[in-house]
């Protein structure tokens, strides 16, 4: 039986989660919380300039949107404590607003009787566990881990190959650079921003800025705590990012040995 999911926040991540869930028989999105009107929410789900148009029929009424006739209830409340997830039987809340990243705030979803878990789609604070699939999912204990961070996109990129190097050769220290597509946090044209570098036009600039991914990776690979640092280059592309890691290994390794280690990891050996 499919798990019933509610999504708080219908930005880039929230929308992608719904799109992915449409064709997943194990997941049923039954409710979302979006700040805009239902017509706009339906249009944003149907059409995407980066990922294309979904083939499904998307319609709406005053209280819901429908995907191929299947109802998804839509709430409109900026206060997460007022969201009636249990009315739709929500079991897992995907926290995708970027606002409730601290578990002390995200736990408000657990006040609803049917909600069992909260998954934060960003780096968390005070969370029960930060989990990157393929790296540390074995650490998950359903009896005690109820508020879980999925980390950042860059951490999800960095952690898998850092794990291979760490397991096979050991890492003494390293420096990471992420070449990162622009995001909605940046400006289309020059405008004020708390980070003056991000105030420059996103589609016209290569913008050096900070990233917490190198340090956050220690949440999923504790043996790397204090060993990695890094920064980001925001580049004028709408999608796809790359991560470059330069590191000193604890034991010698040839190019062939490193490539073979990655080949085996990719094959699940």
Language-model segments: residues:
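N-terminal Rossmann-like NAD(P) cofactor-binding subdomain of oxidoreductases
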Residues: 1-199
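C-terminal substrate-binding/catalytic lobe of Rossmann-fold NAD(P)-dependent dehydrogenases
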Residues: 168, 174-177, 185-269
